[in-house]
A protein has these predicted regions:
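Membrane-embedded alpha-helical bundles that constitute the cytochrome b-like, heme-associated redox core
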Residues: 1-210
Length: 210
């Protein structure tokens, strides 16, 4: 029996959508508190920046643990055959090559920003600890600042690209799926091979060649 192309299939579980939007809000607040003062908008940005940074670190840690132990981490790995399939125009399983690349590059940038940001907390007075600007020598602090700034610029650029592509008419099904969790079989079939990703994890025990 033919499958109904208008039938809804699940793309994102509720917990994944919550993680995405918490991360998105944290990134937007971090970008605002980092770059708005540079262009002349003055406000007390340090508390907002470090508190939001801690929230982002917790969210990232949750994602790493969840992906490693409760999800199929390998479905996001990029293998040589994925490059060959993309070049040949072959449809992907659950995640396309551009989606995997975005996840990998953005994830790396967020990890660098989080790690360097955690070190920079030594220079911030909080209710939990007193600042210690002498934790590292001047040269090492310079490296930390450069890495943090480069990661922030990368995150800003990738976020703008992510928002742009999510608003394109042909990609809007992904945005709706990130909001409501579902897309139609017809929408999924535009970029995904139904034989490799059906929208039902029970039917895709190995993400079917992902």
């Amino acid at each position: 029996m033919a499958l109904d192309p208008k039938a809804l299939i699940t793309r994102h579980a509720p917990i994944d959508r919550v993680f995405h939007w918490v991360t998105a809000l944290a990134v937007l607040l971090l970008m605002a508190s980092a770059f708005l003062p540079i262009v002349g908008l003055e406000f007390s940005w340090v508390p907002l920046h470090w508190i939001t940074g801690v929230v982002l670190c917790i969210a990232v840690l949750f994602h790493v643990v969840q992906s490693t132990f409760f999800r199929r981490l390998k479905c996001m790995l990029i293998r040589p055959r994925h490059l060959r399939e993309f070049a040949a125009g072959k449809k992907a399983a659950k995640y396309t090559l551009p989606q995997k690349l975005m996840h990998a590059v953005l994830g790396f940038a967020v990890l660098v920003a989080s790690a360097t940001g955690a070190i920079m907390l030594a220079k911030v007075d909080t209710p939990l600890w007193q600042r210690n600007p002498y934790l590292l020598d001047a040269a090492t602090w310079g490296v930390v600042y450069v890495l943090h700034g480069a990661a922030a610029l990368a995150i800003l650029t990738l976020t703008m690209a992510h928002v742009y592509f999510s608003l394109l008419p042909e990609k809007r099904a992904y945005l709706r799926a990130m909001i409501g969790g579902q897309m139609t079989r017809e929408e999924a079939a535009q970029f995904h091979d139904p034989a490799r990703w059906s929208g039902n994890r029970k039917d895709d025990p190995k993400e079917n060649g992902q």
